[in-house]
């Protein structure tokens, strides 16, 4: 039974009101005021009869120490028991750090494209070392199968010649059967069986005594070139750096225990020192070969760098080469900004019988081993090379370490709030403990519901925000109960005081928790997994937190009043007497300091820091609200007196209160129309800019942009052939050992040709002969007063007078090494010219200069000597500069670096430039290794470069048959980059049975010029002319459309072959869709493709496997991610707005009070979105979450202002009652006076609580914190300006809330909802399609 329905309880309330009237002496000086509909009783009945009914039982339970203690025990025991049950009897709850959590993986477009990509990956991953071209492989295999089919068709024919030819062709085709079928390729196993899959995924493995023969784990390395404008990774310095990093990895003390040891490595003799571990899968195998027994082994174990261009030419003859480089490298442009490497590790480990033998134990050992590389790899980057490292286990380790470090910042936020709780509970340890405990224990209950009831196995990485947010939300509820209980000191009966606390605080916290939980719950409808899980988890936490506080805090307050409060008061009084010189009365039962002697002498202020309940300080007699709410009045118990001196806190809040009063007097009275005008202008501009916020064009940035893992994730989308498993792509597997003799000409031939071999070995010139090819240019100078120094160049070390030796330093070069004849890459000829023109013979009889041309005899220059240098940087070279002065006597100079040789401002030319000479250390005093500068393509060349494989699916539309979909049921989703799943094949698909229908469909699609560009049909894979053979199978296959491909370009059409059967086929078509169009425009093209294909498929007979075909495109996947992301955000925003509007309508019960709230929310949301647009953000997952939360968090401040407006109307002065304008302004000013300090303090504390989020490495945390702080600042600004101005203009003057108005509001909300439903039904009946959050339409 409610208190307002009990006359006895009303008399008790009136008794307390009479005491309040007696206490407030200032009230009598201000005259009579309007007291509402209730009459003021001077002599209320003093009835102390107990309350009966439900609330009497509730009050007795929470004030009985045994019942209250039992409730506290249950509040702690139930969450603990649920947590134990969850952790012991259910699968472990892990952190979902998958990048796929931010992609819409369950949509049809994603499933189709992933299925095709996996099928291509499986087919491409089956390359053998002797079959490097997928197009030739598939073409030959398909040709063989066609021959076999033709043989079967003509088996009973009478033409013996044709039959014999078919029989000869069949065995010939079988000889080209791919090696991987007979010998399962390790690459195929690795690409499907990695990422910590459970043991039942290893059905293809076999028990073997050989350890570490199966490649199961890997470390991914990417080396980025930096430090110059060219950013070419193929330079001497960068390649040496990369080689050193790879050698450091192999030199790890425990590397041999985990490395991969394939049987092919046993043939590589130099790897014996590494226990025949496989070297990194890297291009370093070409650049750093080793020489053993007159043979070159491409294993990357050499100490010296081979010839860069020659090694590149050799590597580019294999299509696997393109896996290591970026997309820009080609035969014409042999430059790459990056290089990829993989370090492979094998299973089973030593002392394990097989891969399946104690698999989890093996995996745990490897994880403990591989993380020891992190510290070393983090220090390997140089000014020229940035080293990025990753891989499944390193990714997971780095993400979890980052996540844990960021969670430590949550402790800083929680600690600050805990201190705030301790202060605002009057330093009560008991209340502070149970307040924080109720929040923490509610999280365990929410976790149980999330994991057990809803069956979600992983916590999304975004859920870490809950650690920051929930403490602030829960503490607000705790403050509400404590403050409401503290304010009810006028209720002497403890039971009545507890009932009043539960009713008032429970309603207030229910309203705010409902709007907050609804804002988070709106994200449940999002198709982005991370957003969906975050919305569910946060809504559960907010709801559980409210329930926990609702039961825990009243019980704690009951025990605190009976037993703990006296002890805390005596302790605090004792400390106060010892620590202060002046005797002050400690207000242990108040959270406010009254201000005296101000210009507002008749008013008292409550400095609350909470924004969830109406904080009203009125001096008039309060009137009970008909809704059952009891106004929170500021009263002083009779036994207390005000302190003589005000504290600093009182001064601060008094100043803030005075500032707010002056502010609202300006905004609500003097400049209200100006504010409204500015608001409408800003609103229109905000709507314009907010509408320009574009959907995200990529998955969100998960980490700070400069971190190792984020740079690596960004590169994931730009790497060549990312989907290919390429563990055998290095030179170790692609090249057999080469004989060193085959690459050398005799020294006599080289001398005749004027060149020499850059390596010393058998069959090459001797070390002495090589030394004879080198020479030294000596430099001396002559200097006289007032004249510039003249430099002399000579091949003779003697220095005649008046020349002097040049000392090192200041850019001077005493001498440098050169080659007398062209040697290797030292082929740039420089000529030293001498002249006597314009010189004084006594000081410097001659002058010298250097030029790349011949000496200019017309100007007096004569030939002295010539030598050879390198035009580009080489191994063991140093860089020098030469230049000719543009002033008399026009002499030349060689120096170490500018500005010494910048004698002229002209660009590089014949007499000015850069030369690379052998360094002094490189002088061949000792024998060089056989591989130093080795050029494998010197004699016969290495052949033509391989064509870049086009297995990446660009803007093509693929029509696929033989694939039903993708199976993701057994995937482990807690990896940064996890597996996409496995392909579900259509076993009923038979290529030769459906060949006629396929040819007919290919022609039909190719002839549709609205969808396909002319010449854009690629129905068959590249290679031999398969179309000519297809004509023999079916007449429909005549005149198959031929694609317009560039010379050497491969077709995007693909065929999957397994066990001698065509498993699936993919026809590619170059669509007319322009990729630059918006996603919503491209969606129309998708519908055209889907409609046309379905029409064609329906023409096939019933039961045909072709009816299961589908069309897919990577572009469709991208546009649906954008469309569904935006639609999910909009639906979340609309749902959150509807719930908030309904709740506010029921709470305010008046349309003119609802309208200012709605306008304020609209203004806040639009302005925040506009700032997001100005900041360059896109509508991604984090922004989608924020949009819905903005509504729920924006509504609090303005609603509390409206609540203060309503409560002020209960005590409206008589002289304002007849003037609506004055009445609205007075009520607005009173509302700000009563709740202004509270909402401002709450906003400040909210912003401060989000500051630790700014420093998080996880980017969504930092962005979420910025959005919450921004929204809080804009919301409080709009509340103090726009909301006050709108209330003073359109607020109802004399309206007071009643039960009747509440029922009308509920009826209005239900009617509006029914009307909206009817409109939707009418639109659907009229043929209008309503888009749904999942991308479909009703």
From Swiss-Prot:
Kindly state the tissue distribution recorded for this protein.
Expressed in retina, hippocampus and cerebellum. Expressed in the ganglion and bipolar cells of the inner and outer nuclear layers of the retina and in Purkinje cells (at protein level). Expressed strongly in brain and retina, weakly in testis and bone marrow.
One Pfam family name is Sterol-sensing
Keywords in alphabetical order, please.
Cholesterol metabolism, Cytoplasmic vesicle, Differentiation, Endoplasmic reticulum, Lipid metabolism, Membrane, Nucleus, Steroid metabolism, Sterol metabolism, Transmembrane, Transmembrane helix
Q: Which GO terms describe its biological process?
A: cell differentiation; cholesterol homeostasis; cholesterol metabolic process; negative regulation of neuron differentiation; positive regulation of lipid metabolic process; positive regulation of neural precursor cell proliferation; response to hormone
What the entry lists under Gene3D superfamilies is as follows:
Multidrug efflux transporter AcrB transmembrane domain (1.20.1640.10)
Q: What spans does the record annotate as topological domain Lumenal, numbered to this chain?
A: 89-406, 450-452, 539, 694-1128, 1172-1237, 1288-1302
Conditions for induction: Down-regulated by thyroid hormone T3 in retinal ganglion layers during the embryonic development.
User: InterPro entries from the xrefs?
Assistant: DISP3, DUF7023, HMGCR/SNAP/NPC1-like_SSD, SSD
Q: Which domain of life is it from?
A: Eukaryota
* CC annotations in GO: cytoplasm; cytoplasmic vesicle membrane; endoplasmic reticulum; endoplasmic reticulum membrane; membrane; nuclear membrane
This protein's record includes keyword Lipid metabolism: yes
Bilayer-crossing residues are 68-88, 407-427, 429-449, 453-473, 518-538, 540-560, 673-693, 1129-1149, 1151-1171, 1238-1258, 1267-1287, 1303-1323
User: Where do the record's region annotations for Disordered lie?
Assistant: 164-196, 747-768
Q: Which family does it belong to?
A: Belongs to the patched family.
What is recorded about the domains? The SSD (sterol-sensing) domain is necessary for the increase in cellular cholesterol uptake.
Q: What is this protein called?
A: Protein dispatched homolog 3
Name its species.
Gallus gallus (Chicken)
């Amino acid at each position: 039974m409610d208190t307002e329905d009990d006359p006895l309880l009303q008399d008790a309330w009136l008794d307390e009101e009479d005491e309040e009237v007696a206490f407030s002496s200032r009230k009598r000086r201000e005259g009579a005021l309007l007291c509402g509909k209730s009459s003021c009783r001077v002599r209320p009945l003093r009835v102390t009869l107990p309350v009966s009914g439900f609330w009497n039982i509730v009050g007795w339970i929470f004030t009985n120490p045994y019942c209250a203690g039992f409730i506290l025990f249950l509040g702690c025991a139930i969450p603990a028991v649920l947590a134990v049950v969850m952790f012991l009897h259910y699968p472990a709850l892990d952190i979902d750090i998958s990048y796929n959590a931010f992609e819409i993986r369950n949509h049809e477009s994603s499933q189709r494209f992933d299925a095709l990509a996996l099928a291509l990956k499986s087919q491409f991953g089956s390359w053998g070392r002797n079959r490097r071209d997928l197009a030739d492989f598939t073409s030959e295999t398909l040709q063989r199968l066609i021959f076999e089919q033709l043989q079967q068709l003509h088996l009973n024919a009478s033409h013996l010649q044709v039959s014999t030819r078919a029989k000869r062709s069949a065995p010939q085709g079988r000889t080209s059967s791919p090696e991987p079928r007979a010998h399962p390729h390790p690459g195929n196993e690795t690409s499907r069986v990695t990422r910590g899959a459970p043991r039942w995924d290893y059905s293809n493995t076999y028990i073997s005594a050989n350890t570490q023969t199966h490649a199961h784990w890997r470390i991914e390395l990417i080396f980025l070139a930096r430090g110059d404008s060219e950013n070419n990774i193929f330079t001497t310095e960068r390649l040496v750096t990369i080689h050193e990093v790879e050698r450091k990895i192999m030199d790890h003390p425990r590397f041999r225990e985990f490395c991969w040891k394939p049987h092919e490595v046993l043939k590589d003799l130099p790897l014996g020192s590494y226990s025949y571990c496989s070297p990194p899968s890297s291009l370093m195998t070409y650049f750093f070969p080793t020489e053993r027994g007159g043979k070159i082994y491409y294993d990357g174990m050499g100490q010296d760098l081979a010839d860069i261009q020659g090694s590149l030419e050799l590597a580019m003859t294999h299509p696997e080469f393109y896996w290591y480089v970026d997309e820009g490298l080609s035969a014409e442009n042999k430059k790459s900004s990056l290089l990829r490497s993989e370090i492979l590790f094998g299973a089973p480990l030593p002392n394990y019988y097989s891969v399946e033998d104690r698999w989890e134990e093996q995996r745990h050992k490897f994880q403990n081993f591989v993380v020891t590389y992190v510290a070393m790899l983090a220090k390997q980057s140089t000014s020229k090379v940035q080293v990025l490292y990753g891989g499944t286990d390193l990714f997971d380790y780095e993400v979890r370490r980052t996540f844990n470090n960021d969670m430590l910042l949550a402790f800083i936020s929680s600690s600050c709030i805990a201190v705030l709780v301790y202060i605002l509970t009057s330093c009560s340890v008991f209340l502070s403990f149970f307040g924080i405990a109720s929040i923490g224990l509610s999280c365990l209950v929410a976790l149980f519901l999330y994991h057990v009831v809803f069956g979600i196995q992983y916590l999304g990485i975004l859920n870490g925000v809950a650690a920051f947010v929930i403490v602030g939300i829960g503490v607000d509820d705790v403050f509400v109960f404590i403050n409401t209980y503290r304010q009810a000191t006028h209720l002497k009966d403890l039971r009545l005081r507890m009932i009043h606390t539960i009713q008032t605080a429970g309603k207030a916290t229910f309203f705010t928790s409902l709007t907050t939980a609804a804002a988070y719950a709106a994200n449940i409808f999002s198709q982005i997994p991370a957003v969906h899980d975050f919305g569910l988890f946060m809504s559960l936490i907010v709801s559980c937190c409210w329930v926990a506080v609702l039961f825990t805090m009243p019980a704690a307050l009951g025990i605190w009043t009976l037993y703990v409060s006296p002890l805390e008061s005596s302790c605090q009084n004792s400390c106060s007497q010892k620590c202060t010189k002046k005797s002050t009365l400690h207000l242990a039962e108040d959270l406010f300091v009254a201000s005296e002697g101000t210009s507002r002498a008749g008013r008292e202020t409550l400095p609350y820091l909470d924004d969830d309940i109406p904080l009203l300080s009125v001096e008039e007699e309060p009137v009970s609200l008909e809704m059952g709410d009891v106004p929170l009045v500021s009263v002083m118990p009779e036994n207390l007196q005000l302190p003589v001196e005000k504290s600093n806190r009182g001064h601060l809040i008094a100043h803030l209160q005075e500032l707010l009063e002056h502010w609202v007097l300006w905004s609500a009275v003097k400049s209200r129309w100006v504010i409204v005008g500015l608001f409408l202008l800003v609103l229109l501009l905000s709507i314009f800019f907010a509408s320009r916020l574009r959907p995200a064009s990529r998955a969100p940035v998960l980490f700070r942009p400069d971190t190792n893992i984020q740079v690596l994730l960004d590169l994931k989308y730009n790497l060549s052939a990312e989907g290919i498993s390429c563990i055998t792509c290095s030179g170790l597997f692609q090249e057999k050992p080469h004989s060193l003799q085959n690459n050398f000409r005799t020294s006599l031939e080289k001398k005749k040709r004027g060149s020499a071999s850059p390596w010393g070995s058998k069959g090459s010139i001797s070390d002495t002969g090589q030394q004879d090819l080198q020479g030294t240019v000596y430099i001396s100078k002559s200097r006289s007063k007032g004249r510039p120094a003249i430099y002399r160049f000579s091949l003779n070390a003697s220095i005649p007078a008046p020349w002097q030796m040049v000392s090192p330093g200041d850019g001077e070069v005493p001498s440098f090494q050169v080659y007398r004849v062209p040697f290797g890459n030292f082929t740039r000829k420089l000529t030293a010219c001498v002249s006597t023109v314009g010189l004084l013979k006594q000081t410097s009889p001659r002058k010298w200069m250097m030029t790349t041309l011949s000496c200019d005899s017309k100007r007096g220059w004569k030939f002295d000597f010539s030598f050879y240098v390198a035009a580009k940087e080489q191994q063991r070279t140093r860089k020098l500069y030469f230049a000719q002065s543009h002033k008399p006597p026009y002499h030349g100079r060689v120096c170490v670096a500018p500005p010494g040789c910048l004698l002229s401002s002209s660009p590089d030319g014949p007499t000015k430039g850069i030369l690379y000479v052998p360094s002094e250390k490189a002088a061949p005093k000792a024998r060089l290794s056989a591989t130093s500068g080795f050029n494998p393509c010197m004699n016969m060349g290495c052949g033509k470069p391989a064509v870049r494989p086009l297995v990446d699916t660009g803007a093509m539309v693929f029509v696929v048959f033989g694939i039903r979909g993708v199976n993701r049921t057994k995937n482990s989703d807690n990896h940064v980059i996890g597996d996409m799943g496995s392909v579900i094949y259509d076993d009923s698909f038979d290529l030769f049975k459906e060949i006629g229908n396929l040819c007919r469909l290919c022609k039909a699609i190719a002839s549709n010029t609205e969808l396909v560009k002319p010449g854009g049909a690629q129905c068959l894979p590249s290679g031999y002319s398969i179309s000519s053979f297809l004509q023999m199978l079916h007449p429909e296959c005549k005149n198959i459309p031929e694609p317009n491909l560039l010379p050497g370009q491969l077709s995007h059409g693909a065929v999957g072959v397994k066990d001698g059967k065509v498993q699936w086929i993919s026809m590619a078509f170059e669509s007319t869709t322009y990729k630059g169009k918006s996603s919503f425009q491209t969606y129309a093209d998708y519908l055209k493709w889907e409609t046309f294909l379905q029409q064609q498929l329906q023409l096939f007979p019933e039961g045909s496997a072709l009816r299961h075909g589908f069309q897919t495109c990577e572009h469709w996947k991208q546009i649906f991610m954008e469309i569904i992301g935006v639609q999910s955000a909009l639906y979340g925003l609309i749902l959150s707005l509807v719930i908030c509007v309904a709740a506010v309508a029921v709470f305010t019960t008046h349309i003119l009070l609802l309208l200012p709230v709605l306008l304020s929310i609209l203004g806040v949301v639009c302005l925040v979105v506009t700032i997001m647009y100005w900041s360059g953000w896109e509508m991604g997952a984090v922004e989608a979450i924020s949009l819905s939360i903005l509504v729920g968090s924006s509504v609090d401040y303005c609603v509390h202002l409206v609540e203060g407006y309503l409560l002020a109307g209960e005590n409206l002065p008589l002289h304002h009652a007849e003037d609506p304008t004055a009445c609205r302004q007075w009520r607005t000013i009173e509302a700000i006076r009563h709740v202004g300090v509270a909402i401002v303090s709450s906003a400040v504390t909210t912003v401060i609580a989000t500051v630790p989020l700014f420093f998080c490495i996880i980017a969504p945390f930092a962005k979420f914190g910025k959005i919450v702080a921004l929204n809080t600042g804009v919301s409080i600004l709009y509340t103090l300006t726009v909301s006050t101005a709108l209330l003073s203009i359109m607020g109802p003057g004399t309206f007071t809330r009643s039960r009747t108005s509440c029922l009308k509001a509920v009826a209005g909300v239900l009617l509006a909802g029914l009307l909206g439903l009817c409109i939707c039904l009418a639109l659907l009946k009229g043929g209008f399609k309503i888009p749904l959050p999942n991308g479909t339409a009703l």
